[in-house]
Amino acid sequence: TDMTQTVTVAEGRAHVFIAVDHCNSECIGIHADRSANRFQALEPIRQGVAKHFGAVADDIATGLKLRHDHGSNYMSNNFQKEIAFLGIEASPSFVREPEGNGVAERFIRTLKENLLWVRDFETIEELRLALIDFARWYNDNWLVARHRYKTPAQIRENQMTPCDQAA
């Protein structure tokens, strides 16, 4: 998970938070807000947990590890308590080593080059809607070299067992 910034025409600075599955490069959550606090940073995590586990509940995501940097949002007690509540183990990257969170950093670069730097947004709400569309497009269309040029959606489909697909 990580954060970047952009600017909207009418509302000024907006913070964009993302969560990316390190295994298949799928964007599992994306969010924008004027505020850059720990509660906003949790939103993409909650989105991903709700999408892939069906709810946001105590220990529902046990076994997952969450890679994040040492930013104040991610190291805050509120953030750490929330992910622990979900059953997620924190996995902070090394200080001043952005490559330790390389999958998230690469997604942010792709997001900037294909959306944030090439399009203007009037409001944060317009930005949010564009981010949701971008995440959907990315998961279904972006070819990931380390997965032999398959999309994140194709990789996830191949990871699913027949029982998972039936559920």
Stretches found by the model and what they are:
Residues 6, 23, 52-53, 62:
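Secondary-structure boundary/capping micro-motif
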Residues 62-70, 84-103, 119-123:
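RNase H-like polynucleotidyl transferase catalytic core
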Residues 16, 37, 41, 67, ...:
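Hydrophobic (often cysteine-bearing) scaffold residues that line and stabilize catalytic clefts
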Residues 4, 23, 31, 71, ...:
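Anionic group-transfer/hydrolysis microenvironments
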Residues 1-28, 36:
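An active-site-proximal beta-strand-loop segment
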Residues 8, 12, 30-57:
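Active-site beta-loop-alpha junctions of metal-dependent nucleic acid enzymes
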